[in-house]
């Protein structure tokens, strides 16, 4: 089945919308749409994760270091390291959680 990835989830005012595309023993693939001003506060995860920005611009903080990502950019979130996500403007991202 062919599809346009960024069309799989829509923005909602003052919300973060997510849709799980795959959820397997080896990992998961989730698409997110962050409305402007939304954020995920600092947290950790037990697995490595790969983020790709598929629309807009995002601010990802890993262990206190801020990274500004544009559409098409990717970043790896190491397991057990504190990270946060901030939407100064609307953006969409793919999150690949890689379980070991």
List each language-model region with its residue ranges:
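Glycine- and acidic-residue-biased ligand/ion/polar-headgroup-sensing regions
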Residues: 47-59
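Short acidic-glycine-tyrosine-enriched beta hairpin
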Residues: 64-79
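Conserved short histidine dyad/triad with adjacent acidic residue
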Residues: 15, 30-45
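A short, N-terminal "cap"/entry segment at the start of jelly-roll beta-barrel domains
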Residues: 1-26, 61
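Structural motif
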Residues: 28, 57-59, 66, 82, ...
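Ligand-binding loop in jelly-roll beta-barrel domains
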Residues: 79-100
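A cytosolic small-molecule/anion-sensing beta-strand core signal
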Residues: 54-55, 70, 89
């Amino acid at each position: 089945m062919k599809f346009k990835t960024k069309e799989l989830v829509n923005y909602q005012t003052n919300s973060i919308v997510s849709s799980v595309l795959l959820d397997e023993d080896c990992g998961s693939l989730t698409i997110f749409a962050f409305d402007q001003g939304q954020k995920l506060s600092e947290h950790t995860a037990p697995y490595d994760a790969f983020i790709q920005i598929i629309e807009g611009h995002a601010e990802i903080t890993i262990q206190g270091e801020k990274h500004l990502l544009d559409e098409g950019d990717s970043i790896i979130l190491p397991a057990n390291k504190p990270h946060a996500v901030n939407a100064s403007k609307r953006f969409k991202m793919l999150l690949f959680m890689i379980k070991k």
